[in-house]
Amino acid sequence: MNKSCIYPGTFDPITNGHMDVIKRACRVFDNVIVAVALNESKTPYFCYEERISLAKTATKDIPKVSVIGFDNLLVDLAKSKGINTVVRGLRAVSDFEYELQIGYANASLWSEFETVYFMPSLKNAFISSSIVRSVLKHGGDIGSLVPTNVLEEIKGKLC
């Protein structure tokens, strides 16, 4: 049986922490859809198109992964794809509190909806898009925080 999942997020930008979760999901699922959210409630550093492009570049060598953008409810996206499972990364207890609430909200919208949580490896547990943006803003080296194949694209931010 072919089992697929969706890994949603803003990916602003995609990080080595995200890649860690993607690779772990690929060990469990046959197909992983990385779904880049438009999320108008946030003010992204990278525009929507850039975030999709960065995610596609970062995952291009992982055959099980595809990247899409979405601007609707995650549950509606999942239903439209015939997928009832999403994966999320958990770095700390604070992540769990937030993700638990979101998971319950999604399950209340669709009873078949499941959320699977992955912990990143210790070397990536501290990495967040916020940290990458902060280091980038102050001219620091983000080379160990993001996939090498998107490093120059991130440094040459277009939007």
From Swiss-Prot:
Organism: Campylobacter fetus subsp. fetus (strain 82-40)
Lineage: Bacteria, Pseudomonadati, Campylobacterota, Epsilonproteobacteria, Campylobacterales
PANTHER family: PHOSPHOPANTETHEINE ADENYLYLTRANSFERASE
Subcellular location, record wording: Cytoplasm
Pfam families, alphabetized: CTP_transf_like (PF01467)
Family indicated by similarity: Belongs to the bacterial CoaD family.
Record's function text: Reversibly transfers an adenylyl group from ATP to 4'-phosphopantetheine, yielding dephospho-CoA (dPCoA) and pyrophosphate.
Record pathway: Cofactor biosynthesis; coenzyme A biosynthesis; CoA from (R)-pantothenate: step 4/5
Main location: cytoplasm
Residues given in the record as ATP binding sites: T10, F11, H18, G89, L90, R91, E99, N124, A125, F126, I127, S128, S129, S130
Protein name (database record): Phosphopantetheine adenylyltransferase
Catalysed transformations (reactions): (R)-4'-phosphopantetheine + ATP + H(+) = 3'-dephospho-CoA + diphosphate
Top-level enzyme category: transferase
Keywords, in A-Z order: ATP-binding, Coenzyme A biosynthesis, Cytoplasm, Magnesium, Nucleotide-binding, Nucleotidyltransferase, Transferase
Enzyme Commission number(s): 2.7.7.3
An example Gene Ontology CC term for this record: cytoplasm
Site-annotated residues for Transition state stabilizer: H18
Subunit field text: Homohexamer.
Single GO biological process annotation from the record: coenzyme A biosynthetic process
Cofactor field: Mg(2+)
